[in-house]
A protein has these predicted regions:
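Active-site histidine-anchored catalytic micro-motif
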Residues: 1-136
Length: 136
């Protein structure tokens, strides 16, 4: 069985946002692999700890220091100082994630969740494309 769906997420503020429930609520009851791909170049996806909200703050702080908007050497800034830095952060974190699912239940670790990493100061709703491969 192969199942695909496009999900348009609501607009999020800059930062790291848990979207596990938005994805899982749209999945069929099956066993296999879920692949999630974001159709944008200035946002990314990751799987990480979902229990302590300070993790999200620390992620944002770290990536803002690693790829600073205060650097004036970027030339791709047509849409603002967060333009090129968003592309770099997206390249570092990646545009897709995968996780196993068993009988409709994601087999993520106890403290794992799927994050939308929004790198822009202002962004519209992001589109993710979800592919499920497996059987019932």
């Amino acid at each position: 069985m192969t199942y695909q769906i496009e999900i348009t997420l609501k607009p999020f503020a800059r930062g790291f946002h848990l979207i596990t429930d938005e994805i899982v609520s749209k999945l069929p009851d099956f066993t296999g692999i879920v692949h999630v791909f974001i159709q944008h170049t200035s946002a990314s996806l990751t799987i990480n700890e979902n229990a302590d909200p300070s993790v999200r703050v620390d992620f944002e702080t770290h990536f803002n220091k690693l790829v600073s908007e205060s650097d004036d050497h970027y030339t791709h800034t047509l849409e603002g100082k967060d333009d090129m830095t968003s592309h770099i952060k997206s390249s570092i974190l990646g545009s897709s994630i995968s996780f196993p699912i068993k009988n409709g239940i994601p087999q993520l670790g106890t403290w794992q969740g799927v994050y939308l990493c929004e790198h822009r100061n202002r962004a519209s709703g992001r589109k993710i494309f979800v592919t499920c491969i497996g059987g019932s």
